[in-house]
């Protein structure tokens, strides 16, 4: 049965003032239109960067209304009220929310219309939504917040009062039903309830506090890099003026601190990186405790839709795909790159895997992973390939497709790799790959001794040599051994992914991972315990991995693997 609040069809609008927000404004507008906002009213306040160009791209969209603000002094409340008056004179708006370009509304409801309808149904005309401030790690060591674009994080923290004059209300913003004599105050955070006390009723003095599990404002206070936040501070130090506050108001300490930061960190961007992008500190410098950390994947999931729209628009000419490792995961990016090459002229890859450039012919260039935030990668758009957020019914490659917004497009291609590898061994041989990467190693590795025992059986059975793929082999030697082997046997690891590209008969032994995650070539035979999850109803890969014990692979005997090989060779 549909919810009753679905019957209420409010007209909901954003009021926003921007100045030089080229990194965020297009993302912000696009996201909130997708969330169901009817209008976004924007005061373009003396922007000199690409903000103007981005605004112009929305000139034919009747939902985005841009007003040019020429006064260089940044008086937030004055500009917001000017915008508010324009909206009310020319449009009929039921609800307003006041946002900056670096604030994104994350709600439990499917649309903002459903959200405001719920407020209305519960007689809440005035509510506040709290910030969750974004965290980034530019060392790229924390995958939850290692950014490749401006909103690329799932890690946030809830701010708290650090100064005696601060209240929790400083970290919240209002969403309010339109009413007579509406007036914005407190730097654009709230409205003046004294203008219409009867309208607000029980919320005349204190607006309803929306629980954080229902809604939050994902706030990119520090942007996504040090030089960007320094430029933001410079502009605020030069132009901000709060006309709704007395000159001795204690909260003006913030703007004084910003002016001090502009002096302190001039020509010292590295210290900003250290303090706010490595150590995770608040604006005031306090280290953020673990109990204030929260994770939210709203924007990460939405960015997929944004990425696809940009790709299909035809305006994107170059894409950089980012996947740090492991080897097999990076190999499986190739079909995705091939798919995207139908839309763009140039495809790049950024990865930690050395020698990756020698593997692929699909990529125009391969960059080092540590170049991701260096400004050295010249591309129109960048995106991480992440299968980890998809359910356990999809292959890794299909998970990658989902992460770029094309999840419904089935890709069953085997990666195409460079096959020109010089043969270094005379005669036929069986390649045994007994190693895995460190990730879930004990649950994925069948065991070195078992591989040795199996190799002896195979040498006798087929009167041939077995070569063990040991760590001492170089990357090119490994590729050569895989390319020219007669038969391959190994764990579910990088070499097992590579061998399929060369159409070799391969036997892959699975433990905590599952054959269904790999779209295998017709020459590949999976060997695994089919009964391991007989009672389970896992929905995620992590559940499946956690369910396995380290001893699970011991159930697969040497005899079983040997018999499977004899059956298929």
Regions found by a protein language model. Give the residues of each.
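Catalytic-site signature of metal-activated, phosphate-bearing donor transferases
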Residues: 78-84, 107-308
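Donor-binding and catalytic core of enzymes assembling or modifying cell-surface/extracellular glycoconjugates
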Residues: 331, 444-516
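Mid-sequence helix-capping/hinge segment at a functional interface
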Residues: 384-448, 480
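Nucleotide-sugar donor-binding patch of glycosyltransferase catalytic domains
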Residues: 500-569
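Active-site and donor-binding regions of nucleotide-sugar-utilizing enzymes
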Residues: 309-397, 477, 496, 501
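N-proximal low-complexity "stem/linker" segments adjacent to membrane-targeting elements
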Residues: 1-30, 313
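A conserved acidic beta->alpha catalytic loop
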Residues: 44-54, 71-73
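Short beta-strand-to-loop acidic/aromatic patch adjacent to the donor-nucleotide binding site
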Residues: 92-106
């Amino acid at each position: 049965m549909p919810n009753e609040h679905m019957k209420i069809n409010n007209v909901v609008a954003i009021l926003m003032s921007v100045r030089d927000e080229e990194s965020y404004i297009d993302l912000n507008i696009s996201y909130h239109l997708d969330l169901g906002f009817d209008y976004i009213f924007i005061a373009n306040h003396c922007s000199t960067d690409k903000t103007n160009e981005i605004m112009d791209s929305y000139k034919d969209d009747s939902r985005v209304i841009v007003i040019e603000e020429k006064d260089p002094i940044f008086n937030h409340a004055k500009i917001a009220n000017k915008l508010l008056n324009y909206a009310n004179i020319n449009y009929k708006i039921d609800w307003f929310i006041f946002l900056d370009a670096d604030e994104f509304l994350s709600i439990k409801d499917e649309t903002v219309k459903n959200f405001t309808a719920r407020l209305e149904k519960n007689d809440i005309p005035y509510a506040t939504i709290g910030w969750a401030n974004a965290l980034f790690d530019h060392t790229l060591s924390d995958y939850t917040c290692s950014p490749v674009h401006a909103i690329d994080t799932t890690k946030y923290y809830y701010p708290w009062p650090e100064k005696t004059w601060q209240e929790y209300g400083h970290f919240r913003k209002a969403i309010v039903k339109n009413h007579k004599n509406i007036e914005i105050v407190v730097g654009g955070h709230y409205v003046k309830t004294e203008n219409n006390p009867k309208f607000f009723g029980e919320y005349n003095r204190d607006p309803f506090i929306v629980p954080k599990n229902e809604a939050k404002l994902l706030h990119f206070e520090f942007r996504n890099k040090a030089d960007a936040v320094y430029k933001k501070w410079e502009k605020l130090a030069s132009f901000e003026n709060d006309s709704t506050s007395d000159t001795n108001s204690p909260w003006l300490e913030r703007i004084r601190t910003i002016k001090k930061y502009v002096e302190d960190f001039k020509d010292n961007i590295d210290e900003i990186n250290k303090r706010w992008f490595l150590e995770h500190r608040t604006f005031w410098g306090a280290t953020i405790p673990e109990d204030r950390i929260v994770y939210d994947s709203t924007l990460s999931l939405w960015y997929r839709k944004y990425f696809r729209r940009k790709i299909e628009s035809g305006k994107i000419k170059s894409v950089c795909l980012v996947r740090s490792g492991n080897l097999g995961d990076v190999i499986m990016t190739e079909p995705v790159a091939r798919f995207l090459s139908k839309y763009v002229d140039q495809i790049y890859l950024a990865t930690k895997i050395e020698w990756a450039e020698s593997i692929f012919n699909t990529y125009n260039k391969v960059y080092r992973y540590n170049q991701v935030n260096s400004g050295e990668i010249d591309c129109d758009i960048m995106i991480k390939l992440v299968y980890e957020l998809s359910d356990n019914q999809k292959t890794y490659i299909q998970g990658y497709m989902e992460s770029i917004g094309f999840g419904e497009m089935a890709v069953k291609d085997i990666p195409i790799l460079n096959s020109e590898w010089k043969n270094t061994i005379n005669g036929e041989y069986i390649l045994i790959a007994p190693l895995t990467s460190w990730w879930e190693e004990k649950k994925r590795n069948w065991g070195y001794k078992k591989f040795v025992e199996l190799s002896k059986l195979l040498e006798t059975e087929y009167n041939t040599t077995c070569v063990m793929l040991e760590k001492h082999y170089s990357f090119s030697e490994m590729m050569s051994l895989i390319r020219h082997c007669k038969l391959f046997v190994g764990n579910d690891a990088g070499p097992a992914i590579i061998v399929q590209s060369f159409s070799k008969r391969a036997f892959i032994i699975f433990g905590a991972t599952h054959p269904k995650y790999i779209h295998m070539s017709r020459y590949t035979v999976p060997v695994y315990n089919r009964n391991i999850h007989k009672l389970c109803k896992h929905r995620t890969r992590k559940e499946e991995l956690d369910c396995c014990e380290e001893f699970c692979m011991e159930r697969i005997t040497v005899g079983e693997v040997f018999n499977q090989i004899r059956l298929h060779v």
